[in-house]
């Protein structure tokens, strides 16, 4: 259904961003506000990454509760990135923090106004990321991905 749209995005070199995981939207509402969590599993993006290998894809948020699936897709598909928006770094699962093989494909994101950049950065400073990975996450990976 959206493949013509993805073709255009890939052709002009723009990244496609997909919200993955449980972000809290609809929590506590009757029926979860109609949000079907199964569609936020990052494994659904794997097919798109296969069909459009030239399309840069960003998995927004740490993909809770599917962090391992997100890490697997990003490790397997070189054009897939993970952004860290929507969650305070103090709550990141250890496998996300320690997954060194993806150090070049993890991106900063605050998801403002839900989390202010100042709060996110303060929590990031306390997280257990290696010092050499911090500038990659905060700037260098995004600059490279965007061709800046």
Positions of the model-derived regions?
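Mid-to-C-terminal alpha-helical segments outside catalytic/metal-binding sites
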Residues: 101-105, 115-148
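Short glycine-enriched loops at secondary-structure junctions
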Residues: 64, 113-114
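Catalytic pocket-lining loop regions of alpha/beta-barrel enzymes
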Residues: 1-107
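Conserved, mostly hydrophobic/aromatic
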Residues: 9, 61, 82, 111, ...
């Amino acid at each position: 259904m959206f493949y013509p749209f993805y073709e255009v995005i890939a052709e002009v070199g723009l990244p496609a961003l997909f919200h993955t995981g449980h972000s809290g939207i609809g929590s506590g509402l009757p029926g979860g506000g109609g949000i079907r969590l199964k569609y936020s599993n990052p494994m659904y993006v794997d097919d798109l990454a296969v069909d459009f290998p030239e399309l840069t894809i960003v998995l927004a948020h740490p993909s809770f509760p599917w962090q391992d699936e997100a890490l697997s897709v990003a490790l397997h598909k070189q054009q897939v990135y993970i952004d860290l928006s929507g969650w305070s770094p103090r709550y990141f699962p250890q496998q996300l923090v320690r997954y060194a093989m993806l150090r070049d494909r993890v991106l900063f994101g605050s998801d403002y106004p839900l989390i202010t950049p100042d709060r996110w950065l303060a929590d990031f400073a306390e997280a257990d990321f290696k010092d050499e990975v911090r500038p990659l996450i905060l700037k260098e990976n995004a600059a490279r991905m965007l061709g800046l």
